[in-house]
């Protein structure tokens, strides 16, 4: 329907990022994240590991009341988000709206050189679904 080509990344919400990193790095066979960053607008600190072509992200809140903070307070730590690559986020949003999917974003958000948008989690079995440019 929207041309999903692959999973881009999966996000795990954690309270204590350094502790979670130590735990997961051992399992993943990694000495350190492939990428670390802070996204001030989303109020998250992220450690990303690549497993094949898929990003596996551990993320913690950098601000009280952020989406990650609220998620952990409501549900505890765990899988928060699955992101799918699509050829064109703008047209995917239009198609999803036409097919009665509940969107958080009516217009794409932009980070670095990518457009992305979120679907509401409740109708998606409690999972926050992200669509992001990059699928060809």
Regions found by a protein language model. Give the residues of each.
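Vicinal oxygen chelate
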Residues: 1-3, 7-15, 36, 47-50, 57, 70-90, 117, ...
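Residues at alpha-helix termini
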Residues: 26-27, 74, 98
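A short, acidic/glycine-rich surface segment
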Residues: 33-36, 65-70
């Amino acid at each position: 329907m929207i041309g999903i080509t692959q999973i881009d990344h999966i996000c795990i919400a954690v309270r204590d990022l350094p502790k979670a990193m130590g735990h997961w790095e051992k399992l993943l066979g990694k000495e350190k994240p492939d990428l670390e960053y802070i996204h001030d607008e989303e109020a998250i600190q992220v450690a990303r590991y690549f497993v094949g072509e898929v990003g596996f992200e551990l993320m913690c809140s950098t601000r009280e009341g952020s989406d990650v903070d609220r998620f952990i307070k409501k549900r505890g730590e765990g899988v928060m988000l699955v992101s799918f690559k699509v050829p064109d986020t703008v047209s995917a949003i239009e198609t999803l709206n036409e097919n009665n999917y509940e969107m958080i974003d009516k217009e794409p958000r932009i980070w670095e050189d990518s457009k992305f948008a979120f679907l509401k989690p409740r109708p998606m079995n409690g999972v926050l679904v992200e669509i992001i440019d990059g699928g060809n």
